[in-house]
A protein has these predicted regions:
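Primarily recognizes the serine-hydrolase "nucleophile elbow" in alpha/beta-hydrolase
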Residues: 43-105
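Catalytic histidine-centered segment of alpha/beta-hydrolase-like enzymes
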Residues: 33, 142-154
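Serine-hydrolase catalytic machinery in alpha/beta-hydrolase-like enzymes
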Residues: 1-58
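Catalytic histidine neighborhood in serine/cysteine hydrolases
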Residues: 129-145
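Short beta-strand/loop motif that positions the catalytic acidic residue
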Residues: 103-105, 109-112, 116
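Acidic catalytic loop of the alpha/beta-hydrolase fold
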Residues: 114-119, 144-145
Length: 168
């Protein structure tokens, strides 16, 4: 939760008219519990989606995750989710074929840094080729940590959500 990507999104989305809820997974920061290797963290995500959907009725909820959080985000599902955005997802911590986002007709955006140290764009494209309703976009010049590249992440996340919220 305390990194440049999540902080930039949390600071920028509300000023673009998009609400944001951020949370730590179990065992991170002041959160209780033990790390669950992704499986238990999916439950944390689903609880966060329930919370977000109860804040304001009939508002689309998008799951946005970065790095490990992206894998968890893409694996989690909830009846109120409108779609998924995975930022620098390793596509390895949870089996990609088990990720709900890849099996669903709701929209999914994968933002892959051109110079990601953990998963190349071509590897990500190959892994996600069978996914439905999924767009994969490379962010030129960025590496996995997006130092100096958070604004393109914020811009594309905002525009992707706006595309689908504007349809409803």
């Amino acid at each position: 939760m305390r990194n440049n990507v999540i902080q930039a999104l949390f600071d920028s989305l509300p000023s673009n008219g998009i609400g944001a809820v951020r949370y730590n997974f179990r065992g991170v920061g002041n959160s209780a519990g033990k790390h669950g290797n992704g499986e238990l963290e999916v439950l944390d995500s689903q609880a966060a989606f329930t919370f977000a959907s109860q804040l304001v009725q009939n508002i689309p909820v998008f799951s946005v995750g970065y790095s490990f959080g992206a894998d968890v985000s893409l694996a989690a599902d909830h009846k109120h989710l409108a779609g998924w955005i995975g930022i620098a997802s390793p596509l390895a911590l949870i089996e990609p074929e088990e990720m709900k986002a890849g099996l669903d007709d709701r929209p999914t955006l994968l933002l892959v840094p051109e110079n990601d140290q953990f998963r190349s764009t071509e590897e990500a494209r190959t892994i996600c080729e069978p996914w439905v309703a999924t767009s994969l976009e490379e962010l030129a010049g960025a590496d996995h940590f997006f130092l100096g590249f958070t604004q393109p992440v914020v811009n594309r996340t905002t525009s992707f959500i706006a595309e689908f919220v504007g349809q409803g």
